[in-house]
Each structure stands twice: as structure tokens, then as C-alpha cells.
């Protein structure tokens, strides 16, 4: 049976992905892995909102998505960012199809909290049949994090949560958060395998600080019955060499050494 990896690429890293990253994807495809990508686009949405002079505000770290903001978010996520990614994959000999969570009923959501967050959804249902069909035909689905309600209203969704939901529905072997660092570091050495308990300890000890904390928390929340392994890898270098993944692996529990 073919194995599956879902990648989550943040908006800040998409245009910085290295040649090695794309070569690694080719190697994985050649080795029989099925691949899907979920991407963000926060910085580009912010830039477009500024250009169009549309005011935006944040609440609890999440952008308040008014209807004008949602229009811009959909334009950027499903448009410029998604198609840039598809073109980059094509340049490297990888067939890809750009879709959003609205396509094929992939992500169904309800309003998270309209008062606080506006047009932002909480994912309630995932239908991964379209994603599976693309992957079975050797095509990498590139998914923008938009969703629809049961009565077909468009809602923005958090890209990390979208990636987790897609990985869960696909029963993916791995969910990889693609960042600009080699993984979780301690004293300039990468920590190869961590459990949630160890991560909480490292946050307490201030080994994990700053911008790494939300990345790690997203990885932790992605661990579930369906997704047993999450990795933090570097998209600016190589994350796969000699059939081995390089990064920090986060698992529910470490295997006992016999």
C-alpha cells in the first residue's frame, strides 16, 4: 500500500523553498509516496489588504475576517499563492492541481465565533475523496485553506488546522510542518524525536521560545488517533536524504528499547 504525507507550508516560507525541497518531493514520489500540500498565505494577504487600503484587525492571534477581508483572502489563497506553488512544482517536473477546501466538498465548517473572528470557520467534516483521486493519479493536490458551510457560505480556516484535518481524513503516515529551521534545537543540536510531555518541558525551560512555540503547538494539536507522527522540517534545505527524513519527529510516545 502506498504511503501518504501531508505537508503544511506557511505563507512566509512558500517563496523561499529550496531546490533541495523540490528535489526531495521528486524523490518521495519516485519512492512511491503519495503527497498532498496545504498552504497558508498570511503575509501576502496582509500586503494585498494594505494595497487595497482595507483595514484589518487581529483577535487572539487570528485575523478578524470581515467580508471584504474574506474576498481578498480567497483571491490571494486560491489565486496568486496557490497557482505560484503549482507552477513551481511543475517547473520541477511534479504534476500538481491547485484546489481549495471548497472544491469537492473537501472541508465543511461552521462559524467559529462570528462576533470575534468574523468569517472564520471551524472544520466539522472532511471529504477527502477528491484529494485521494488526484493522488491516485500521480497528481499532488495543493490545497488553499478555505471551506464552506453546509449552506455553501465561504469561510476562511486556519491552515494548520486544515492540514491536520486533511491528514486525519487521509490517515496519513506523516504530517510535516515545513518551516525555515531544521527542527527543534537545543544547544545548537537538533532534537530528533520528542513527545508532547518533553515539548512542554522544553517550553518551560525556554529552550523552545518565540516563533517556534506556535509551530510546535500546531504540531502537538495535529497528533491524533489518525495522525501518529508529525514532523517539523526545513523547507530551505534538504529534509530527505538516503531514504531518511531529517527534522524533529513528534510522537505520542517513544518506542520502548528492548
From Swiss-Prot:
Family matches, as InterPro entries: AceGlu_kinase-like_sf (IPR036393), AcgluKinase_fam (IPR004662), ArgB (IPR037528), Asp/Glu/Uridylate_kinase (IPR001048), Glu/AcGlu_kinase (IPR001057)
Keyword Transmembrane: no
Family per record: Belongs to the acetylglutamate kinase family. ArgB subfamily.
Known role: Catalyzes the ATP-dependent phosphorylation of N-acetyl-L-glutamate.
Pathway(s) annotated for this protein in UniProt: Amino-acid biosynthesis; L-arginine biosynthesis; N(2)-acetyl-L-ornithine from L-glutamate: step 2/4
Principal location class: cytoplasm
PANTHER family per UniProt: N-ACETYLGLUTAMATE SYNTHASE (PTHR23342), N-ACETYLGLUTAMATE SYNTHASE, MITOCHONDRIAL (PTHR23342:SF0)
EC numbers on record: 2.7.2.8
Keyword Cytoplasm listed: yes
Keywords: Amino-acid biosynthesis, Arginine biosynthesis, ATP-binding, Cytoplasm, Kinase, Nucleotide-binding, Transferase
Annotated compartments: Cytoplasm
Pfam family of the protein (one): AA_kinase
Site features described as Transition state stabilizer, chain residue numbers: 8, 215
Catalytic activity: N-acetyl-L-glutamate + ATP = N-acetyl-L-glutamyl 5-phosphate + ADP
Database matches in Gene3D superfamilies: Acetylglutamate kinase-like
Cellular component GO terms, alphabetical: cytoplasm
Organism, scientific name: Bacillus subtilis (strain 168)
Annotated residues for binding of substrate: 41-42, 63, 156
GO biological process: arginine biosynthetic process via ornithine; L-arginine biosynthetic process
Sample GO molecular function, one term: acetylglutamate kinase activity
Name used for this protein in its record: Acetylglutamate kinase
Amino acid at each position: 500500500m502506498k504511503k501518504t504525507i501531508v505537508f503544511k507550508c506557511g505563507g512566509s516560507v512558500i517563496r523561499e523553498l529550496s531546490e533541495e525541497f523540490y528535489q526531495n518531493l521528486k524523490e518521495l514520489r519516485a519512492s512511491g509516496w503519495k503527497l498532498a500540500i496545504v498552504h497558508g498565505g498570511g503575509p501576502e494577504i496582509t500586503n494585498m489588504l494594505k494595497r487595497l487600503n482595507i483595514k484589518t484587525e487581529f483577535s487572539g492571534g487570528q485575523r478578524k475576517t470581515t467580508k471584504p477581508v474574506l474576498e481578498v483572502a480567497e483571491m490571494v489563497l486560491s489565486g496568486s499563492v496557490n497557482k505560484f506553488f503549482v507552477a513551481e512544482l511543475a517547473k520541477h517536473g511534479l504534476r500538481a492541481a491547485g484546489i481549495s477546501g471548497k472544491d469537492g466538498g473537501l472541508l465543511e465548517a461552521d462559524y467559529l465565533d462570528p462576533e470575534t473572528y468574523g468569517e472564520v470557520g471551524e472544520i466539522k467534516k472532511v471529504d477527502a475523496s477528491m484529494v485521494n483521486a488526484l493522488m491516485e493519479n500521480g497528481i499532488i493536490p495543493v490545497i488553499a485553506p478555505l471551506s464552506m458551510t453546509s449552506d455553501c457560505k465561504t469561510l476562511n480556516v486556519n491552515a494548520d488546522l486544515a492540514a491536520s484535518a486533511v491528514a486525519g481524513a487521509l490517515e496519513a503516515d506523516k504530517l510535516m510542518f515545513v518551516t525555515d529551521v531544521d527542527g527543534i534545537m537545543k544547544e545548537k543540536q537538533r532534537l530528533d524525536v520528542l513527545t508532547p510531555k518533553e515539548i512542554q518541558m522544553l517550553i518551560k525551560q525556554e529552550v523552545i521560545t518565540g516563533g517556534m512555540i506556535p509551530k510546535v503547538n500546531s504540531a502537538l494539536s495535529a497528533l491524533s488517533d489518525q495522525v501518529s507522527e508529525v514532523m517539523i522540517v526545513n523547507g530551505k534545505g534538504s529534509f530527505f536524504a538516503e531514504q531518511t527524513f531529517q527534522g524533529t519527529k513528534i510522537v505520542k510516545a517513544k518506542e520502548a528499547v528492548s
